[in-house]
Design a protein with these regions (language model features):
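ATP/NTP-dependent adenylation/nucleotidyl-transfer catalytic domains that generate, transfer
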Residues: 40-44, 53-56, 77-78, 95-182, ...
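Conserved small/polar residues in nucleotide/adenosyl-binding loops
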Residues: 1-5, 441-447
Length: 447
């Protein structure tokens, strides 16, 4: 009889173990661990069913264990010691398992060469109105348990810090230059760079934070940028780019009242030029601030904020950036900057490239233009890791977010995500180096 590993290697996605295992104190915990590990090892859905009430109890008792696991996760478990017959039902994602097997290069290397009987089973159900029992996490990059979240944040920050430590050590740089906008991404980049310099025992004054007010900069973000740099003890500089951009507009024949993409991108490229030149002057590195979600959408100016000398946030999705900043804000050593960080977290996400309102409020809000980042991160996670088709992504998002977003709105932003994801690949092909923080960032596509 084939071992279960052989069944999986031969292509079986669903492994069923019919057992007659008795119950003992502590045995169930071990059994659960064994089942979940086996499903992870074989990249399969694993069903375990053992006999229960009605069996002889001369000297042993059967609890009626029923467990369903999928790739290391316990999906459903039957009630133990029940006196009644019961049916345990769970949804398992066969497509997900098949994708994971294709991506695991070593899996196919051990495919059995001996004859194996295969019986085809159709996966499609005739029950069109089948009510799915499985739930989907709307924020797949963020652990639900507080303890796991703490561990995840600490781990990602350490990955970012050690990546930058190695880059500084390798290049021999002793200075860093960062554009500070008063937004989430540049804030996280500054926090990571400060921790890096602390670890290298370099003075924080060797970090030059530059705020570069433009046509859309608001008082709130400008104030937070200056306050954060001062409280963190880095070298602070302020260079207003408005006049330089106006001269540039005249040089290229752009009307000053033109609010086209050229108007916006010229500001981003002016800022990058300033950062690069100051880094050259000081013998330092320009630290990139763009995050994984922005890069997936191509929401960056090519050769503007898209470019740096090392992008510390390039492997961190936007929904996770907010949690990382919040985690750092809650640390005891962050007491002096906590209020500033919390205000930055509450600030609407915006590139601030178009003029603000008369009241000085942000008018250009990113999530109103390209869609909610929590939706895009949901699409990103499931599309890149599992290759789900659009119809399935739409279905899963409807299940995950419930009534928060109408079906039509989810469809609208899914179309935006897919269109931008593929059309903006040319930007990702020319990215600077940056640390891989989550396990779904290594994707190579032709442009």
């Amino acid at each position: 009889m084939y071992k279960r590993q052989h069944h999986a290697l031969a292509g079986a996605n669903l492994l069923i173990n019919l057992s007659a295992s008795n119950e003992m104190t502590g045995k169930h915990t071990y059994l659960r661990s064994l089942i979940t590990q086996q499903s992870a090892r074989t990249l399969s859905a694993y069903l375990y069913c053992s006999c229960g009430f009605g069996e002889s109890s001369t000297d042993i008792v059967f609890a009626g264990n029923g467990l369903i696991a999928e790739n290391g996760i316990l999906v459903k478990e039957a009630e133990r010691f029940s006196l009644e017959e019961q049916l345990t039902i769970a949804d398992v994602d066969i497509e997900r398992l098949m994708t994971l097997r294709r991506k695991t290069n070593t899996f196919a290397d051990y495919t059995p060469q001996t004859p194996y009987r295969r019986i085809a089973v159709p996966l499609r159900s005739d029950r069109a109105n089948y009510a799915i029992t499985r739930t989907f996490d709307p924020h797949p990059f963020i652990p639900q348990q507080a303890e796991a979240m703490q561990e995840r944040c600490e781990e990602i920050v350490n990955i970012q810090v050690n990546g930058l430590v190695q880059r500084i050590h390798h290049t021999g740089a002793r200075h860093a230059v960062i554009g500070i906008s008063g937004g989430l991404d540049s804030t996280l980049a500054l926090l990571i760079t400060a921790r890096t310099f602390d670890k290298l025992r370099l003075p924080r004054t060797a970090i030059t934070g530059i705020t570069m007010p433009g046509f859309g900069t608001t008082g709130r973000t400008h104030s937070n940028a200056l306050k954060l740099m001062e409280q963190m003890g880095v070298t602070t500089d302020e260079i207003n780019i408005c006049e330089a951009c106006k001269i540039h507009f005249r040089d290229i024949g752009l009307d000053a009242n033109d609010r086209s993409t050229t108007y916006e991108n010229a500001q981003a490229r002016e800022r990058t030029q300033i950062l690069m030149d100051i880094a050259n002057r000081d013998g330092g590195l320009v630290i990139g601030t763009g995050d994984l979600s922005e890069l997936a959408l191509g929401w960056a100016t090519y050769n503007g904020d898209h470019m740096s000398m090392y992008g510390v946030n390039s492997g961190v999705p936007k929904t996770l950036v907010r949690y990382l900043v919040r985690w750092i804000a809650d640390l005891p050593e962050s007491a002096s900057i906590r209020s500033c960080l919390l205000d930055i977290i509450d600030t609407p996400i915006s590139p601030e490239l178009l003029p603000a309102s008369r009241e000085g409020e942000i008018l250009q809000k990113t999530e109103e233009l390209v869609g909610p980042y929590e939706l895009h991160d949901f699409f990103l996670y499931h599309f890149v890791r599992f290759g789900y088709r659009p119809a399935k992504l739409h279905f899963m998002a409807r299940q995950a977010f419930g009534e928060k977003y109408p079906s039509s709105e989810i469809k609208k932003w899914l179309i935006v995500f897919l269109r931008r994801f593929f059309s903006q690949q040319f930007k990702r092909s020319a990215l600077p180096d940056g640390p891989k923080a989550v396990s779904y960032t290594h994707l190579t596509l032709p442009t």
